[in-house]
From Swiss-Prot:
Reaction catalysis annotation: a [oligopeptide](in) + ATP + H2O = a [oligopeptide](out) + ADP + phosphate + H(+)
Disulphide connectivity of cysteines: none
Regions annotated as coiled coil: none
Stored InterPro entries: AAA+_ATPase, ABC1_TM_dom, ABC1_TM_sf, ABC_transporter-like_ATP-bd, ABC_transporter-like_CS, ABCB9_6-TMD, P-loop_NTPase, Type_1_exporter
Keywords: ATP-binding, Lysosome, Membrane, Nucleotide-binding, Peptide transport, Protein transport, Translocase, Transmembrane, Transmembrane helix, Transport
Superkingdom: Eukaryota
Residues marked Intramolecular salt bridge with Arg-57. Essential for the release from the ER (site): 17
Subcellular location: Lysosome membrane
Domain notes: Divided into an N-terminal domain (TMD0) comprising four transmembrane helices and the following core domain (coreABCB9). TMD0 is required for lysosomal localization and LAMP1, LAMP2 and YIF1B interaction. The core domain is required for homodimerization and peptide transport activity.
Name under which the protein is recorded: ABC-type oligopeptide transporter ABCB9
Protein EC: 7.4.2.6
Length: 762
């Protein structure tokens, strides 16, 4: 809101508040003057204190208005930071007004003064308005800034936006339970039945006591006891059914959340996985989703049950004694405020705990997945120490949570104790004065204990919900994330020749935005031909493969497949016609048959066997105990490096792809196996366009075209003999290998390491 509007509205209300309160006070004291009322003030008879409270809150609002008007930049921020002040003022005045009503009731039974009731009601109206106006002043912007587009709302610090965000997250979370509406309706029915049964129990307990103490009737006592038993049995049965249904509903919610999150993750662009650690993603997928469903299910169940119980309890409490009910409600606003403060703090801590746990999970996942490397360097103890340090960070946050919970329980428990002592003392006064029976007092005290338990549960529900919402926000952050690279191509021709053209391709990884990996790279792959990429480590060979697989978007240029941009092809179709075999292929924990046919809907077993024979894998597969049904283990751990490469080669060949990419695909094979695979590929070239990255001279020299890369640029192209005749980089690489100075056609032997989540191979 614009500044002048907020100031005008606030000043108008302050004037009206002072005017109305003064008028009511004057009409209620026509028989004496203000000075006489001040000199002979009697808290049981005068409303001068309520008029003084009006002046105090008006001065507070005037001060806030002046502060915002004089400094429209810092003023609203200061008001947002001091929201606790106006909350405490409104709370204290509201409690004092209730106490005033009780004091008046002691000398005026009943209270028939209309001016007192008018001032009593107006006090609460003005308190609510004062609180809202304080929030209004805290959201204003300078007039010039308010006129700018996009500045209509408040987006700064403060509690309101955070509360709205939490509410929106909770609402969105509950929207995932829409398929289970029928279950929720049934659970709500049994919840109401159970809560109503529990609500009537104290009432009939009081009736049983009155039948003994007052009526002294055994029949009435027996009737009351039978009703109590029936209510207890019925409410227990309904509560059990309610709990079972809620557990089922939120188990389905957990599955739904995990499914949505996993689908969102696998649809993200490749750069997303370079920027996010695997452990963090696994933590979101497992611990966070479980925490969300468990905490939300438990706390919503408790919240709904206690809401119904509180409604019934309040009705019975007012029917038994409106005076004791007012005493009871004097303390609960304080408990609610403490719960609110604690819930916000706990929500922030919960987010930090989840992030710390995710970091610990990342460390554990990284260590366990590379256990052979850890053991080869005898670094087990150091890795355990690193993990312990991560856990200690979690423990520090847990200690803060424990301290916050201790303070919350102490504050709310002390307030509740004060309320209970006040009820007992004032209730005894009402019984002695004949305004209440002993049975009603006992019933009221039981109701007060029930109400206290309900409010305490609601307080813990709030903190639990905030913890669940904190985890849900992290889950929805990934569920709602839209991939920056969308695979929305539609081309899927029946016939594909397999010609590939790189035209002035410029490329940079998102994790290294200032390093150009490829610069104006141009070359072509011809159908029926073998093209080899060679060059030093980091020259851009593997990046060309990543681009051809459409893993990353380009910064410049384009890659064409049969004259069409690769992004124009259907995602499934593109990766059916382009197959990649990498140096360290990944196999899944499935059978060999499932690994070879991976990604294809239906593949005849004969085609699987044929592909395995071409890849020289059929022999070792048949020697395994279960043959093609043998489980490969996690990441193919049950197979050797050479066996994994041959299975991966079969996985590529079973598709009969027009374009075949071999990225050091035979590096782990013996000479005989490599020769057989090369013969299978070269003997069927009319059906493939082949791109190879290899460092063995025997593999490279047979290529129809050799493309030499250096520092992201194409420096030479030609056949083996042509490039040797030209001299240059390729001739140097060949000379180094022939002299035994370096094993591969590369400056750095063995550079082909798989890229980590934070680094890319080029």
């Amino acid at each position: 809101m614009r500044l002048w509007k907020a100031v005008v509205v606030t000043l108008a209300f302050v004037s009206m508040d002072v005017g109305v309160t003064t008028a009511i006070y004057a009409f209620s004291h026509l028989d004496r003057s203000l000075l006489e009322d001040i000199r002979h003030f009697n808290i049981f008879d005068s409303v001068l204190d309520l008029w003084a409270a009006c002046l105090y809150r008006s001065c507070l609002l005037l001060g806030a208005t002046i502060g915002v008007a004089k400094n429209s930049a810092l003023g609203p921020r200061r008001l947002r930071a001091s929201w606790l002040v106006i909350t405490l003022v409104c709370l204290f005045v509201g409690i004092y007004a209730m106490a005033k009503l009780l004091l008046f009731s002691e000398v005026r039974r009943p209270i028939r003064d209309p001016w007192f009731w008018a001032l009593f009601v107006w006090t609460y109206i003005s308190l609510a308005a004062s609180f809202l106006l304080w929030g209004l002043l805290a959201t204003v912007r300078p007039d010039a800034e308010a006129l700018e587009p996009g500045n209509e709302g408040f987006h700064g610090e403060g509690g309101a936006p955070a509360e709205q965000a939490s509410g929106a997250t909770l609402q969105k979370l509950l929207s995932y339970t829409k398929p289970d509406v029928a279950f929720l309706v049934a659970a709500s029915f049994f919840l109401i039945v159970a809560a109503l049964g529990e609500t009537f129990l104290p009432y009939y307990t009081g009736r049983a006591i009155d039948s003994i103490v007052i009526q002294k009737s055994m029949d009435q006592f027996t009737t009351a006891v039978v009703v109590v038993c029936l209510l207890a049995i019925g409410s227990s049965l309904a509560a059990g059914i309610r709990g079972g249904i809620f557990t089922l509903v939120f188990a389905r919610l957990n599955i739904r959340l995990r499914n949505c999150l996993f689908r969102s993750l696998v649809s993200q662009e490749t750069s997303f996985f370079d920027e996010n650690r695997t452990g963090d993603l696994i933590s979101r997928l497992t611990s966070d989703t479980t925490m969300v469903s468990d905490l939300v299910s438990q706390n919503i169940n408790i919240f709904l049950r206690n809401t119904v119980k509180v409604t019934g309890v309040v009705v019975f409490m007012f029917s038994l004694s409106w005076q004791l009910s007012l005493v009871t409600f004097m303390g609960f606003p304080i408990i609610m405020m403490v719960s609110n403060i604690y819930g916000k703090y706990y929500k922030r801590l919960s987010k930090e705990v989840q992030s710390a746990l995710a970091r610990a999970s990342t460390t554990a996942e990284e260590t366990i997945s590379a256990m052979k490397t850890v053991r080869s360097f005898a670094n087990e103890e150091e890795e355990a120490e690193v993990f312990l340090r991560k856990l200690q960070q979690v423990y520090k946050l847990n200690r803060k949570e424990a301290a916050a919970y201790m303070s919350y329980v102490w504050g709310s428990g002390l307030t509740l104790l004060v309320v209970q002592v006040s009820i007992l003392y004032y209730g005894g006064h009402l019984v002695i004065s004949g305004q209440m029976s002993s049975g009603n007092l006992i019933a009221f005290i039981i109701y007060e204990f029930v109400l206290g338990d309900c409010m305490e549960s609601v307080g813990s529900v709030y903190s639990g919900l905030m913890q669940g919402v904190g985890a849900a926000e992290k889950v929805f952050e990934f569920i709602d994330r839209q991939p920056t690279m969308v695979h929305d191509g539609r081309l899927a021709p029946d016939h594909l020749e397999g010609r590939v053209d790189f035209e002035n391709v410029t490329f940079t990884y998102r994790t290294r935005p200032h390093t150009q990996v490829l610069q104006n790279v141009s070359f072509s792959l011809s159908p029926g031909k073998v093209t080899a990429l060679v060059g030093p480590s980091g020259s851009g060979k593997s990046s060309c493969v990543n681009i051809l697989e459409n893993f990353y978007p380009l910064q410049g240029g384009r890659v064409l497949l049969d004259g069409e941009p690769i992004g124009a092809y259907d995602h499934k179709y593109l990766h059916r016609v382009i197959s990649l075999v990498s140096q360290e292929p990944v196999l899944f924990a499935r059978s060999i048959t499932d690994n070879i046919s991976y990604g294809l809907p239906t593949v005849p077993f004969e085609m699987v066997v044929e592909a395995a024979q071409k890849a020289n894998a059929h022999g070792f597969i048949m020697e395994l105990q279960d043959g093609y049904s043998t489980e490969t283990g996690e990441k193919g751990a049950q197979l050797s490096g050479g066996q994994k490469q041959r299975v991966a080669m079969a996985r590529a060949l079973v598709r009969n792809p027009p374009v075949l990419i071999l990225d050091e695909a035979t590096s782990a094979l013996d000479a005989e196996s490599e020769y057989l695979i090369q013969q299978a590929i070269h003997g069927n070239l009319q059906r493939h366009t082949v791109l190879i990255i290899a460092h063995r001279l025997s593999t490279v020299e047979r290529a129809h075209l050799i493309v030499v890369l250096d520092k992201g640029r194409v420096v030479q192209q030609g056949t083996h003999q042509q490039l040797l005749a030209q001299g240059g980089l390729y001739a140097k690489l060949v000379q180094r290998q022939m002299l035994g100075l370096e094993h591969p056609l590369d400056y750095t032997a063995g550079h082909k390491e798989p890229p980590s989540n934070t680094e890319h191979k080029a």
